[in-house]
Amino acid sequence: MSNFAKIFQSNWIDLNKLGKLEIFLKTILGIYKAPNRTHLLAHAADISSFYAVKNIYEYMKNDDEGKEILKNKPLLIRQDIQFNELKKLPKNTLGYKYMEFLETYKLHAHDREVAHFFDNINYSYILTRYRQIHDIGHVVYNLNISIESEAALKMIELIHTKLPITLLAILVAPFMSPLYRFQYIFKDKIPPNFLNPNFDYTYXDDYNYIDELSLKQYVYNLTEYFHIDKINNNLFFQKLYKYYFDNLNNSNHIRGTIIYGYNNENNNDIIFDDINNEYIFLKNPEKNYFLFKYKPRQTLLNQLYPWAYMAGMAAKKPLHSIHIENWLDKDIDIFRKTYNIIPLPDHLNLMSGIN
């Protein structure tokens, strides 16, 4: 018996159509109230995806590589993959990049929900595999886990899978994406009083840039992602972590991100920001941090979605029908070239790429 056969037997939930409809409506309501509860999204996808998954199955059983995947049902789990060995691979291999992504964002393939509501083991496997391969999509397309990056990947997945839940994500994401995002990038370490209400976010320098904003005009929230490897103060870390989860999906406020360990190699204090078509003040020597300002919603609609549509159409095969497991020790650029995968453009890398 394959590993997935055991997983299928222990996770299958037998429900009639009325029961599935009830769960679907409850999960949609739950997603609206708490978008970060990903298992609700998974349940909604289970129930709404029957015809899309059936079409994926028909495609895979008529494709040599897809047929092999359906027969062996490989999984990105510890029983099938030696994850620690992937860390020892050369740095430009798909497996190394995959592990680097998972560890950067504190993720694991085991976290992906198994499909519960399919009677057919092949259908259940296809949706489960799609969820596990999702992180591979982040890696090969070079997308981080911000709302707008997730939405761009959903656009690619919609083209490849036709899953209704991907369309829902694409439609909802612009309303969840913040209008502005401020990134404070600290050269040395985050000041201990950064979250203190009295911390001065304003600029007292001679330089100004178009539409300069004092952050005191807004409720400043920390969201998206941050690195904590240089923080020794546990109390500060706990406070930062709480801010992160409290505001993870709150798009009613201006939202910010902390990253640090960045060195300014630009000789000029004023640079032209091609993303937002404006001049920005880059360096603040006195406070020892740099500021970048993005417009995620605008970038998602005007740049990320068009690129994602083009990338989705250009790919030779959807990721779920590629035997990814055989590529983990291969060069990621060769993988991209083989399947004509177009990664995120360089000019969007700082905002939406894996950093």
Curated annotation (Swiss-Prot):
Enzyme Commission number, as recorded: 4.1.1.130
| Keywords for the protein's UniProt record, in alphabetical order | Lyase, Membrane, Metal-binding, Mitochondrion, Mitochondrion inner membrane, Ubiquinone biosynthesis, Zinc
**Topology relative to the membrane, per the entry?**
Peripheral membrane protein
Record keyword Transmembrane helix present: no
Q: Which Pfam families match?
A: Coq4
User: What does the record give as cofactor?
Assistant: Zn(2+)
Name the domain of life: Eukaryota
**Catalysed transformations (reactions):** a 4-hydroxy-3-methoxy-5-(all-trans-polyprenyl)benzoate + H(+) = a 2-methoxy-6-(all-trans-polyprenyl)phenol + CO2
- Protein family membership: Belongs to the COQ4 family.
User: Any additional notes?
Assistant: This protein may be expected to contain an N-terminal transit peptide but none has been predicted.
Query: Which HAMAP family does the record cross-reference, listed alphabetically?
Result: Coq4 (MF_03111)
Name of the protein in its database record: Ubiquinone biosynthesis protein COQ4 homolog, mitochondrial
